[in-house]
């Protein structure tokens, strides 16, 4: 006498033998060597993605859908996978049906559960498995939520005393263990980050330099500071250290200013005497330095060029007269 196989078991058998499950359950022990293992894995992947039938966009959608489902919480992932979405848009539609609006009318962020959440996979157990449905994160033989089990799907509800959800994250992706700073309310997903943030409020500087005793809040700041001490591995070598100040042996007897070169001292002392030994041959104006009178004579040259179209020649037929010392 034949025993009829229930529809639920038949659907599970198809799912467990799907190309996606064969690809995910692959182990190196399934092949005699690494080269054979790579070839077998490549063949299993082709059986799942079927590049001869699907376009690149369709295969990419399968990979995106798998990663999207693996990022969901375990209970939500089990419920969405039991509906066998064929694309990311179908998975998003199921999540919107499950989680509903972001907040209920009374102001809380509780989410509603559709009527068929606890119906289990029997409602869709007769759906044919095409081998394209990646049940990401579900172990072989795992069943969906059992009928009548009220604990199968428990959507996350933020309690009034719980910290606020992480900004920028959807409600179903914010972990219930998210912590926030009691001082300013800043939310952190990692306790280590929160601990380091709270040190900024207390002013605590637990990391002290053994060389000079200066304290720092973060360890990397201390490491960077220790490199500035001479002899440390990160301190600059002799070639990178600033050179000592050079001696300036030539000093002015009037103001005490010192110079490296004697010529600079001689030129400086003329500023105290007020002497202007260089005169312009055009207007007779005197200057203390030769380069100043040369710069001044360019003004006369430009004026003459604009008035006559050429610069007035000097005594030898060349350019303007060079400056000569007065007296």
Curated annotation (Swiss-Prot):
Q: Does the keyword Repeat apply?
A: yes
Q: Which residues carry this modification: N-acetylmethionine?
A: 1
Which keywords does this chain's UniProt record carry? Acetylation, DNA-binding, Isopeptide bond, Metal-binding, Nucleus, Phosphoprotein, Repeat, Transcription, Transcription regulation, Ubl conjugation, Zinc, Zinc-finger
Q: Which Pfam families match?
A: SCAN, zf-C2H2
State any single GO MF term. sequence-specific double-stranded DNA binding
In this chain, composition skew of type Polar residues spans 106-118
Q: Name one GO cellular component term.
A: nucleus
Q: List the disulfide bonds.
A: none
Region annotated Disordered sits at 101-171, 220-243, 305-327
Phosphoprotein: is it a keyword of this entry? yes
Q: Where are the zinc fingers (C2H2-type)?
A: 179-201, 207-229, 250-272, 278-300
Alphabetical list of InterPro entries matching this protein: SCAN_dom, SCAN_sf, Znf_C2H2_sf, Znf_C2H2_type
Residue numbers bearing the Phosphoserine modification: 18, 104, 235
Compositional bias (Low complexity): 134-148, 305-314
Cross-link (Glycyl lysine isopeptide (Lys-Gly) (interchain with G-Cter in SUMO2)) at which positions?
Answer: 8, 190
At the top level of its lineage, which domain of life is listed?
A: Eukaryota
One annotated GO biological process: regulation of transcription by RNA polymerase II
Task: Tell me the ranges covered by the SCAN box domain, including all copies.
Answer: 20-104
According to its UniProt record, where is this protein located? Nucleus
Member of which family? Belongs to the krueppel C2H2-type zinc-finger protein family.
What does this protein's UniProt record list under function?
Transcriptional regulator. Binds to the 5'-flanking critical region of the SCARF1 promoter.
Name this protein carries in UniProt? Zinc finger protein 444
> What is the organism lineage in this UniProt record?
Eukaryota, Metazoa, Chordata, Craniata, Vertebrata
